[in-house]
Amino acid sequence: MRTLLVFLLLAILVAVLIGNVQVEACKEVDECGDMFVCIEGICEPLIG
């Protein structure tokens, strides 16, 4: 039971760290590539 709790806490920590990296991934509009645009720090696909 204790091992499962430690594993879940580590998984949550890794998910938060990955989320922070993705939010800070882009700062310029054209930084994400051809079919994506940077909106509020996140690469979003162009629709339309």
Curated annotation (Swiss-Prot):
Propeptide part(s) removed at maturation, as residue ranges: 22-27
Q: In which tissues is it expressed?
A: Expressed in salivary glands. Highly expressed in the head, body and tail with a 2-3-fold higher expression in the head.
One GO cellular component term of this record is: extracellular region
Q: Where is the signal peptide?
A: 1-21
Q: Keywords on this record?
A: Amidation, Disulfide bond, Secreted, Signal
Any remaining note in the record?
Does not show effect on voltage-gated calcium channels, potassium channels, and tetrodotoxin-sensitive sodium channels. Does not show activity on Nav1.7/SCN9A, and shows very weak activity on cation channel TRPA1.
Q: Which family does it belong to?
A: Belongs to the annelide toxin family.
Q: What does this protein do?
A: Leech salivary gland peptide with unknown function.
- Protein name, entry field: Peptide HSTX-VII
